[in-house]
Structure formats: structure tokens, C-alpha cells
């Protein structure tokens, strides 16, 4: 989070990206770049307070597995990243594809 080269790279790449996703404490990196300003966000439960400090202009949810703002989405912990990923698959390719993907992974997805 305190690596300016990394956060500058994330900010630059995000300007070209169709989607920007973070899993777990990756939300802190997005916060550091300002990408969460004015958006909803979440992160691992152990980093919620730090995310609130790092992204004071974001609405931080401690009770959500993931948050989808359209172009920017964040998940809570690592396993919640699977839920977010399947949500994005459903959004881009349809619910049936996401359900087949979850079955292939043997993951009990509950959209």
C-alpha cells in the first residue's frame, strides 16, 4: 500500500481497464489510488477500519461479501472473491455460464 510505483501503476492501468476488481485487502491499494472515492467498498474483516481510514470518501461495508459498483468491484476475504468472480461471470456471460462454472469448481454458489 505504501509502494508509490505499484499504486501509480494500478491507477494508470485502471484508466484503460473495462473492469477493476480487488480481492481481500487489495481494496486498500484501490483506496490509496483514489479509485474508491464516492463508491461502495469492502475488504477482509480484519482491514475494515484501515479501509475506512484509507478511503474516507468511500462507503465501506463490513457486512458484504462483495460490492459491485459497475466498473469497480471489491470482495471481502479470499473466498468472497470467488463469489464476486462468479457474479462478474454472470454479469458478462450470463447466469447459466456462472452456474456451470460454479458446478465445475464444486463451489456452492448462492447468487
Predicted regions and their residues:
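Active-site-adjacent pocket-lining segments in enzyme domains
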Residues: 1-111
Amino acid at each position: 500500500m505504501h509502494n508509490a510505483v505499484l499504486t501509480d501503476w494500478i491507477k494508470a492501468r485502471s484508466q484503460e481497464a473495462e473492469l477493476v476488481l480487488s480481492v481481500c485487502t487489495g481494496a486498500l491499494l484501490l483506496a490509496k489510488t483514489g479509485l474508491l472515492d464516492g463508491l461502495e467498498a469492502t475488504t477482509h474483516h480484519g482491514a475494515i477500519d484501515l479501509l475506512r481510514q484509507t478511503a474516507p470518501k468511500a462507503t465501506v461495508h463490513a457486512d458484504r461479501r462483495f460490492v459491485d459498483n459497475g466498473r469497480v468491484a471489491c470482495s471481502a476475504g479470499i473466498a468472497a472473491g470467488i463469489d464476486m468472480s462468479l457474479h462478474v461471470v454472470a454479469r458478462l456471460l450470463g447466469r447459466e455460464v456462472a452456474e456451470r462454472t460454479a458446478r465445475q469448481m464444486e463451489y456452492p454458489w448462492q447468487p
